[in-house]
Structure formats: C-alpha cells, structure tokens
Amino acid sequence: MGCCGSKEKYNGEDVPKSQRLENRPTNDVNGKQPQRQQPPNKRKNNTIRKGAASASQQNNPTSLFEITDLSLKNDIIEGLQEQPQDSDLLAQYGVLLSMEGKNKEAEESLRKAVEVDTDNSRAWQAYGEFLERTNNPKKAKEVYGEAYKHAAPKIALDEDDSSLLLSYAIFIQKSGEIDKAEKLYKRIVTSGARSSESLGRYGLFLLEVKKDVEKGGIYLKDAADIDPPSPEWCTRYSNYLKTYKKDEFEATKYQKRVSLYVN
C-alpha cells in the first residue's frame, strides 16, 4: 500500500487518493462545509466508478448495479465519512450492502438516498432495481411510480433520467401494462439521451411485443450503429438480419463490428 500522497488509477487517470471524489468540499474558517456549486439544471454526481471506459461497455452504464462492485467499498465508505448526506454515495453504499446480502441495511441506505435528493434519478433507479432483485414487485412499482413524478416533467431527459424511465418501462412491460410501457419507450427515445440500450430495448419491444418487424429493425440498427459499439446490440441486430432479412453478409458485418471498431 502506498503512502497517502501516492497516485492510483481512478476513472482511467492517475489521481491522488485524496482527490478521488470530484470537488470534495473543504471546511471554511468556521468549520462548516460550503454549498456545492452546480450548473443550472445539472445536478452534481459523486458516483464512484472503476473506470469510465469499462463502464461505457456495460449494458446499462448508469445502473449502480452495473458499475459498482465490492472493490469500491473502501472508497465509498471514505466518501460517506466526508459527505454523509451525499445521495449518490448513499445509493451506491446501498447497492454494496445488497451485494453483501444485508438487504435491510441496503434498503435503509437507498431510501435515505432518494429522501436526501428527490431529483437523483440514478438513486431512484437503484432503489427500484433493488426491490425487483429482492422480489418485492409491489413496493418496486410504488418506488418507480414516485420516481416517475420527479423525472417525467423534464422537457429533456439526461442519461440518468432516461435510464430510470427505461427500467420503469421494462418493469411495467413485464407486469403486462403494454400501452403504458410503449408510451414510456417513445418518450425515452424522443426526449432522452441517445443510447444503444434505450434504442435496442424499444426495438425489441416493437419486434417481440408489437410484432412490427420493420420498425423494430430500424431501432435495433440504430442501437447497433452507436459508437462505441455495444457487443449485445450488434449481436442482436446481426441475429435480426439473419432471422428476418436472411442477409448473412450484413449480419456478419455487424457481428464483426465490435472487434473492428477503433476509438
């Protein structure tokens, strides 16, 4: 273990351990922490990642269950010691507790995260996902519904808002509320952050639920064409081309697209 001034890889860069959380507040002369300055309509995000590059290749890069693992535990606890009311860190700590099987403590931390910042879509999504994973669909529906009230009124959805509403759309689709799910999918792809996951999920919905082969294919292609390419959605579109278009040549191109991509 290096000394306190040593540098370690963090978010793909060499960053001193003491600076791992961006813009950590420092106490003023009275011992109080100043208010964090935030751009208008843009909330600060203190989520700790292993690295931005690896996260971009995950199925859902804004889901805390995708970008968090136990190797981050010490960093998250350290962050909470300095900022005990930070919504991002509380949510991420809840995910860690869930991974350790401490579901009661996990829910307490996740609930506190959304109480501290009701506009934190990533925390709401983590809370909803946690309830799904612990087989509590009734409570999950309540949480997603409450989260929707905070995210839906926004004219433009950012990445976290889109990811939250996508999780909600998938959840209510599984519950059989097809019309409501379709409205959510449409909202995400028209007003949300453009991502392979949202485009692909809507494409699958159109293909498998609405039985619209042509329109479903359009969205699957859009998902596969996004850079950096998603292995999952390139493969899904390749399979679509083989199954519905009998186009082996194009299917092979998309199957190879990930390995040929140069950033």
From Swiss-Prot:
Q: Which residue ranges have biased composition labelled Basic and acidic residues?
A: 1-25
Q: Which UniProt keywords apply?
A: Repeat, TPR repeat
Q: Where is this region: Disordered?
A: 1-62
Reply yes or no: does the keyword Repeat apply.
Answer: yes
Q: Which InterPro entries match?
A: CFAP70, TPR-like_helical_dom_sf, TPR_rpt
Q: Which residues form a coiled coil?
A: none
Record's Pfam families? TPR_8
Query: TPR repeats span which residues?
Result: 87-120, 121-154, 162-195
Indicate whether Repeat appears among the record's keywords.
Answer: yes
- Write down the Gene3D superfamilies for this protein, in alphabetical order: Tetratricopeptide repeat domain
Q: What is this protein called?
A: TPR repeat-containing protein DDB_G0285095
